[in-house]
Amino acid sequence: CKYSVYFMQKDSSDNLIFPVLPLRDVIVFPNMVIPLFVGRDKSIKSLEVAMDDNKQIMLVAQKTADLDDPQDKDIYRYGTLATVLQLLKLPDGTIKVLVEGSDRAEIQGEIYGDTYFEAQVNIIEEPMVDDREVEILSRSVIDSFDQYVKLNKKIAPEVMTSISGIDDPARLADTIAAHM
């Protein structure tokens, strides 16, 4: 790899068990606050378990969005550990939940559970990088995204104002990816 960026995983003794929420057509990044509408029984139970414990839940994307009952093989291994900020039960039996992504994480082993999904999760530390190189790359990414915003009328130009003020390279990448 040309760039001095690499990911480190914490020691396996730091692995913890968390409820897992498979997501359809959405990816949640660290530092992102987003409402989700949840209706599947296993997913609702995963949220209830998270609320009863420490409000932490592993958010991972499904490989195919139209599966109503995804199995371990249908779910990506990497996702975001998130905190449930608010949970609202709706009259139709579904749940509206507000979550905030906190850490990139990897599922270790299998996702298991009969009534809800849970898995052993390993937090991935942020990459170690050269500050000068990061500054140059960040500027290049911001310039490229600015061109993208000018060509794509679906993104409000004000987004560039908030992106220009982000100093953390991981947060910059996550914020830009969320707008793609």
Annotated model-derived regions:
Residues K2-M180:
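N-terminal low-complexity, acidic/polar interaction/targeting segments
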